[in-house]
Amino acid sequence: MSHKNLLIIFTRNPVLGKVKTRLAKTVGDKTALDIYHFLLQKTKEVTKKISCDKKVYYSEKIIEDDLWDQSIYQKKEQYGNDLGERMKNAFNDGFKKNYEKIIVIGTDLFDLEPTHINEAFKKLNHNNVVIGPALDGGYYLIGLKKLHPKIFQNKNWGTSSVRKETLKNLEKVDVHLLPMLNDVDVIEDIKNHSAFTKFLKPR
């Protein structure tokens, strides 16, 4: 532990037919996987120079020799029955190691920038929780100074109700909301985005 702050990146192992499945219904499994690799690369570029400890949590198994440089990113496997339990466990692991501020992000966001993550750490100085709201009703970032187990329980993960239910759990604490951004889940999320044009050209 070289920093007091920890950035956790939740990632799915990039396997054909297992990632961006809703997007794949329109563009096919191969293009969906290509887009996911593109998003992984963008997430790495955004996070690699942030001044904090960084840990990648893999959905299935740790890949030693991949794009996440082990001199920058620690590596761990997610564990828990659903996304909420896996996030709760990741936060818990970090707080047990005495990190003061912990942020979790995913790898589904092209529009995420270092400024969003830096602002989240900064806002945790004066807020209990920071949330980056996603257009689909979920969130792309959550930052905590201590564990709030309720926010990870009894949620229909992947649905439009998640953020609303989470904020309801946090009515009695100070929450800062970051700018709203858009996750990449379905074709509508990328069809008018210039960064993805190369994936949508007729082949």
Each language-model region and where it sits:
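N-terminal nucleotide-binding beta1-loop-alpha1 segment
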Residues: 1-22
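A short, N-terminal amphipathic alpha-helix
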Residues: 34-52
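Acidic donor-binding segment of Leloir-type glycosyltransferases
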Residues: 51-74
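Short phosphate-binding loop-to-helix
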Residues: 68-101, 159-160
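Short aromatic-hydrophobic micro-motifs that form the base-stacking/packing surface
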Residues: 103-105
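Conserved donor-nucleotide/metal-binding helix-loop-beta segment in metal-dependent transferases, i.e.
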Residues: 110-138
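Short, glycine-/small-residue-rich phosphate/pyrophosphate-handling segment
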Residues: 148-167
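Conserved alpha/beta core of the MobA/IspD/sugar-nucleotide pyrophosphorylase nucleotidyltransferase superfamily
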Residues: 164-203
